[in-house]
C-alpha cells in the first residue's frame, strides 16, 4: 500500500520504518489524552536510566480546537505518530529525513527546514530543546530533546519525534481539506475518505465540548481523579522506607483523567484565567508525583529486588 495514496498507508509505512530501526511498535493508550506525549510509553519511560525505543499512533483530543467540522484543518480529535528514543541517537535528524523518504517525501526535492521551537508541557512539568520540521513552508513534525519530564531531569536525554499525521497526509496527498483525505487507498465506490470516518464525530463532539458537557459533573470528575491519584500514590509504597512503588501506572491513569476533565472544562468556558492556572498546577503536581513514583519501579530504574518488595508470592494474595 503506497503511503502517498492513503492515510492508513502512511501510518503503516512509518510503523514499518521505525520497527526496522528497532522500536517497539505499541498500540494507542486507551484513555483520552491531549497529545501523544501523555502516553506512559513517553512520559514515564523517558525517566530513569534504562534504554527505550518505541513508536505508536496516539489519538489525541483537544476539545477547545473543535470547529464543528467546518474548518478544513482544525480538529478536536486527531492523530499523532510518536517516536521516543532513549538515549537520543546522534543521527536523529537523519533518521527523521529517512522516515520522510519512506512515506514518499524526498528531502532532495523538497524544502525541508528545522525551525527552532523549544517545547514545554505545563501540565506534565516537562520541557525540552526542540525544532519544528517544515516541508515546503508547512509544519509537519516536531522533534524534541527532553530535558525534564514530571519535574525530573532526564538522564540520559531522550529524543522525541511527533508527526502530525493529518497534516502530513494532506501534504503528501496534495489536498487542502482534511476530510478529503483518502483513508484506504481505494478509488471509486470503494474509496473511503477521512470525512467518511470522522466528520460526524467532529460535529457531534464539538457540540458536546462547547454546548452540552456537564460542567458540574466535570468539576466533580476532576476532584475524583485528583483524589484517586493521590490515594494510589500514597498506597503504592511498599513500606515506610519508600524504596519501591507498586502503583505508579494506576496513579498516572488518574492524572490523565484529571487532565482531560480540565481540558473539557476549559473548552466549556467555565474556568477563569486565574482558575485555569490553578488547575494546570494541580495536574502538574500529580504528574510530578507520578514521575517520582515511577523512578521507584523496576522499569523506572529501581533495582529488581527492591521493586519486588511488598509483592505477594505467586499463587498467594496479600
From Swiss-Prot:
It is an enzyme of class 6 (ligase). GO terms for cellular component: cytosol. GO terms for molecular function: ATP binding; glycine-tRNA ligase activity. Residues 298-318 are annotated as: Disordered. CDD domains: GlyRS_alpha_core. Keywords: Aminoacyl-tRNA synthetase, ATP-binding, Cytoplasm, Ligase, Nucleotide-binding, Protein biosynthesis. It holds the Pfam family tRNA-synt_2e. GO terms for biological process: glycyl-tRNA aminoacylation. Coiled coil: none annotated. InterPro entries: aa-tRNA-synth_II/BPL/LPL, Gly-tRNA-synth_heterodimer, Gly-tRNA_ligase_asu. It catalyses: tRNA(Gly) + glycine + ATP = glycyl-tRNA(Gly) + AMP + diphosphate. Residues 300-309 have a biased composition (Polar residues). Its EC number is 6.1.1.14. The keyword Ligase applies. Tetramer of two alpha and two beta subunits. NCBIfam families: glyQ, PRK09348.1. Belongs to the class-II aminoacyl-tRNA synthetase family. This is Glycine--tRNA ligase alpha subunit. The gene is glyQ.
